[in-house]
Amino acid sequence: MAFASSIQFCSLQWLLILLCLGNTFSQSIVKTLPGFSGLLPFKLETGYVNVERSEFFYYFVESQGNPLTDPLILLQIGGPGCTGLTGLFNQIGPLAFDSSTYQAALPSLKLVPNSWTQIASIIFIDAPIGTGFSYSTCAEDYIVSSDTNTASMLGKFIRKWLEGHLRFKANPFFVGGDSYGGLLAPIITREIVEGNKAGLEPFINLEGYYVGSPHTDTNLEENSKIPYAYGMGLISSRLFERAKRSCKGEYLNVEPTNLKCLEDLAKISECTGNLNIHHILRPNCSLSLPMPNKDKQARRSIEETNSRYNRHRYLNFWCKGTVTEWTRCNDSVTYGSYIYDVESAIGYHKYLTDTRIKVLIYTGDHDMRVTHISTEEWIKSLNLTIDDDWRAWYINGQIAGYTETYKKSKYSLTYATVKGAGHSPTEYKKAECYGMFERWINNYPL
């Protein structure tokens, strides 16, 4: 199951840049980047942290506010297998591609006005192993790479990272997760909680975690898509009611003898199958490309290239001690060796809501990959007390989405929808998401 973003990097040109960034020692300060004029107006550090036999590569952007007191965030991106650069350039980092220069030999970079690094220091991690520049010197480590193994490794990663960055030891610490990283974030957070309890050093000043468009429970997410499609006007009320009766609310694991249900699901698929499920209002690029006059030839070329590429990546997956080929989302991780050993992360959220930390969960209301319906359903299962009932929240006098807050003791869980956003919200509504984060991190209501 791939939770990679539909937005792709300009691979050829940026591979060259990434190789430049990748030629680092354990830590390197990057002061300039191709495509950006002059010195970077923020501190960017790249490097490796060794965890057992694995080398985790990271991009660290120091807060542009007060780095010695501002929050420190470890961000896990989705896929699994998508590089932390996705978060840095596409979501909450201080730089983005200038789309007006995409036809140039080298695309330009521009500063982002709503970067979360204005008020927080962020570690963008390449994880699990095999993602981005992260690698292992032992082939066995790729075989055992899994949800729980990755979370355990990243719990060790952050303590070792802090050992080399002791000036951030006292900063309030948060784990962030996006898309499939939303499943990993609470598992990583629990690793940190348990490590603190066990007296591991350095102690991590954990204050909370947040997840955006979080993959949490496959059954809930898949079964929510049909009610979501009806609610968004994508299927008729007649078809929806008929499918509810024939499938009895279970749309994922349908018995092959239930022909009425299968027929209804086929009709629903006809209505929704060609949508861009990451944002239902956006074009489905796989249908619009390549250009019509080169359609057959281009499609055949793409299919052949992808076939060769996937075989090449799989056969050379055990290359040890280096990263010979960089890709934004490594299919050899997503569809190959990675073990999906956590079917539902709800239990981790239940555990964490009993601890002394705060939580932010947000979704895009036009996301059909992980619908807001499924997220609201598992939040309800946590049996928390509503502290601030469902209401609109605003940015610049306009409704930015809807929110409600749950409370347990003095610590709270804030849930928010982001109006008009897809999967993931920070890619579509940067100003709104920045405002949401700024209020939450400073303990203000949305």
Question: Language-model segments: which ranges?
Answer:
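Terminal and linker regions of secretory-pathway proteins
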Residues: A2-L446
